[in-house]
A protein has these predicted regions:
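Intrinsically disordered, low-complexity, charged terminal extensions of DNA damage-control enzymes
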Residues: 1-46, 51, 214-325
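Catalytic cores of DNA base-excision repair glycosylases
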Residues: 16-26, 34-35, 39-226, 230-239, ...
Length: 325
């Protein structure tokens, strides 16, 4: 699509009389940019990472917010920054203390990657946070979304920050039926967003898309179209198909495992072991456990292999543990 005026189009060229906006992707999204920014500035939530905004604070918040709800992150974020207020402190904190600060947020590799990236910043940039999208993107554990958040929010660089909220908003505005689980679809949406970023408000525009998806253009049910500042530009709304977008194919079936968990206790002490440094729940502590159901005799034999001699074996009630790491 080309949105232009006073122009002549031939197979070889486009001649334009006066400077105009040329949109090769989505004219609807281009037209939505200004009202989205105005709406965001008037309606944005008061969040701790939006106060005294700098690269380090935004970085920590964006990593914490991956796969985690805003309300759950708030107390962790404030406690984390109080103890680790800058890159140097994060680079030097012992891993056990770092994981204790992160305890309860899950996806612990996020914390390890933060520490490793902080070391990169100290080593390669003298402790000063890098200021270009490409340099930020090279930090350990920093993908296109996180780099695309820091670059425009802090340094006003016109790069897209496309997360699940933005995928939902853009696919609804454009009625894009591509599967959002595919990397190619995310790349396509990133290009659409990047093309229409207002040069004078890259941070607010990116945040407006995220904010709209978080509080208005909701998933899993009816979106609040009556509160949307761009509903008249939304093709899905025009078609009455808001809940048909985004399109996402079903995820793989869950794997179910049955294990026997052994809680070896001696007065006030309990035996735990550390998981391998790589793989599922890497480096985390756990109770010894084995696949399948162990009999009393097998528990005693397994304990002896660990250098323990159970005196009494007491069965515990069955329990279910679900996680998505």
């Amino acid at each position: 699509h080309i949105l232009a005026r006073d122009c002549a189009v031939t197979p070889e060229s486009i001649s334009i009389q006066d400077p105009v906006d040329v949109v090769l992707g989505s004219p609807r999204l281009k037209e939505a940019a200004e009202p989205l920014v105005e709406w965001f500035r008037a309606n944005k939530r008061d969040l701790p990472w939006r106060q005294r905004m700098n690269a380090y604070r935004v970085w920590i918040s964006e990593i914490m917010l991956q796969q985690t709800r805003v309300e759950a992150v708030k107390p962790y974020y404030e406690r984390f920054l109080k103890e680790l207020p800058d890159v140097k402190a994060l680079a030097e904190v012992p891993e056990d203390r770092l994981l204790k600060l992160w305890e309860g947020l899950g996806y612990y590799n996020r914390a390890r990657n933060l520490k490793e990236a902080a070391g990169q910043i100290v080593r390669d940039y003298g402790g000063k946070f890098p200021e270009t999208y490409e340099e930020i993107r090279r930090l350990k554990g920093t993908g296109s979304y996180t780099a695309g958040a820091i670059a425009p929010f802090v340094y006003h660089i016109p790069k897209p920050a496309v997360d699940g909220n933005v995928l939902r908003v853009v696919t609804r505005i454009t009625a894009c039926g591509d599967d959002i689980a595919r990397a190619a679809t995310k790349t396509k949406i990133e290009k659409l967003v990047e093309e229409v970023i207002p040069p004078d408000a890259p941070g607010d525009f990116n945040q407006s898309l995220i904010e709209l998806g978080a509080i208005v253009c909701l998933p899993n049910g009816e979106p609040k179209c009556g509160e949307c500042p761009v509903r008249e530009l939304c093709l899905a709304h025009e078609l009455g198909q808001e809940t048909d977008f985004p399109v996402k194919k079903k995820e793989k079936k869950r794997r179910i495992e049955k294990r026997t968990v052994l809680v070896f206790r001696d007065e006030n002490e309990t035996a735990v072991r550390k998981r391998p440094a790589r793989g599922l729940l890497a480096g985390m502590y756990e109770f010894p456990n084995v696949e399948g159901h162990l009999t009393r005799e097998e528990v005693i034999g397994y304990g002896k292999k660990l250098g323990l001699a159970p005196i009494r074996v007491k069965p515990l009630p069955a329990a279910k543990h679900i996680f998505s790491h």
